[in-house]
């Protein structure tokens, strides 16, 4: 069993432009998981860099609203929405709301720096 207290996890700066709290990842979990889950935060007007990752991702929006670009499609997302991002998709997410955009990102297989490529 592993419990992560949100208040005790420090934000790190992501290469793509977001603040990130890494909750579970194979490197910090003892039970041999193959996925990772992290909370991302974007300030008002913030946008991640265009990037692609070899893994599939699921976003679950905790707060705020945004614009999610996946390849050639653009989607509006808001609190309690979820989105599937296929592997190797060109993507970014932008905060278009009036408060922080916070979302969980589940990556399978787990996120690895060498699998994430910034495109801009």
Question: Model regions: which residues?
Answer:
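Glycine- and acidic-residue-biased ligand/ion/polar-headgroup-sensing regions
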Residues: 56, 60-66
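Conserved hydrophobic/aromatic beta-strand scaffold that supports enzyme active sites
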Residues: 11, 22, 37-41, 58, ...
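Short histidine-centered beta-strand/loop micro-motifs
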Residues: 31-32, 47-53, 94-96, 116
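Short beta-strand His + acidic residue motifs that chelate non-heme Fe in jelly-roll/DSBH
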Residues: 48-50, 68-69, 85, 91-98
């Amino acid at each position: 069993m592993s419990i992560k207290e949100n208040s005790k996890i420090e934000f790190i700066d992501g290469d793509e432009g977001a603040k990130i709290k890494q909750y579970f990842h194979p490197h910090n979990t003892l039970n041999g998981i193959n996925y990772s889950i992290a909370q991302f935060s974007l300030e008002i007007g913030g946008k991640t860099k265009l990037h692609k990752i070899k893994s599939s991702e699921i976003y679950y929006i905790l707060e705020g609203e945004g614009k999610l670009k996946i390849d050639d499609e653009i989607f509006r997302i808001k609190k309690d929405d979820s989105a599937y991002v296929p592997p190797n998709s060109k993507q970014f997410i932008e905060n278009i709301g009036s408060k922080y955009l916070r979302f969980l990102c589940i990556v399978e297989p787990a996120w690895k720096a060498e699998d994430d490529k910034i495109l801009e």
